[in-house]
């Protein structure tokens, strides 16, 4: 449920046993957003083929040789399978009966299955929450309680196991003085009591995926927090995962096993270098390089005077702008070889049949931002940290009303954030669709924010995973998704639970 572009589903579908046989089959995924659903549908279409037998037509589609419609026409049985399993519906009271029939028909009496998904409690995201909390309609906005639709699905179908994913902001959110997470935990443990005000009935034991101590209705909800970077994902992504096991099933889930993630450079460093575009005026390699060279022509030396890092940064900037290896193109189509780092997350991304690297096109930026990006990347290269606004010379400061407050550390002092090469990235969020200031590439000569493909790699999506729709939507899809590599590890735990059940369910 609430499938988005399919990160959770991808992880569950790629979870295999010791004989490389899939442990899960996705019988239905539901999503309401047009472009996310198109991405989801395409992936379900591919999964309708036997494992390892993606048709050549898919790669021709990625290469632009045929259209999606032509590909679907050539493979009608798989297209029809995807029509049944990837469904575009907006969950709510008006579609409840339709969803109930759909899920019942697709389950077809199966006893061993899992319900996965993250009801979109957008109001509790840490981003923008302070603005929403004081809104007079906040407590009564139906969007914030879409998880109740999730509860209705649990009541209707009594899944043996569910996995609910949501944002870290749930830990601190309150509505009318009540902690939201406490209410959600209570409701998930006794969904029928929550919806029908009954004292007993359907119940679930709730478990953490990352901690040995077992949560209950009164325990610290932070036990449900999963830090993706602790489990091999090259990104500091902290999300809530609550596993529910039906009361009549006497099985406890295992735990995720901590292991080291690859770094940003190990994950995206071997992708071809591309330059950003100029959003105003003529955009060509010469004009772009001219704007970069302007960084050394101003009063940068005087403005950095006194800073202990001034000489090193100025020297490094001159070195980079005199380099003849500036990338000339805004996009790269050539698919690179395997990354040098051997890591399960990186190996899972690679597809030797690819010849085209999809989604590796840099967005356009204002000329002033290009110079800010180069300064920020050089600063990070020298100082091994991303600069704060107080580190920027005045000539590079944005014309923004909050700059002074940012320089003093009051708010958004890290408005320009470099993704450091030898660490994991910061959280890839849907905000990347609006601007790239928080997602600056560490290579100074590229002067740009991350491409869709780089963001997707940091989210551990396979390189053959195509995101449909305009680029803004692609960024949004990537930022909102669950990393498939993490989802696959969760799927292993859930599969073990289901395998331990008696055949009677």
Residue ranges of each PLM-predicted region?
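Core alpha/beta nucleotide-donor-binding catalytic domains of modification enzymes
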Residues: 3, 7-157, 168-182, 215
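Generic C-terminus detector
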Residues: 470-505
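Polybasic, glycine- and aromatic-enriched phosphate-binding surface used to engage nucleic acids
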Residues: 354-469, 473-475
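Class I S-adenosyl-L-methionine
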Residues: 106, 126-399
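Extracellular structured ligand-interaction cores
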Residues: 27, 112, 223, 237-241, ...
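Short, flexible loop/turn elements at secondary-structure junctions
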Residues: 2-5, 34, 119-121, 168, ...
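A structural signal for well-ordered alpha-helical segments within the folded catalytic domains
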Residues: 6, 10, 34, 38, ...
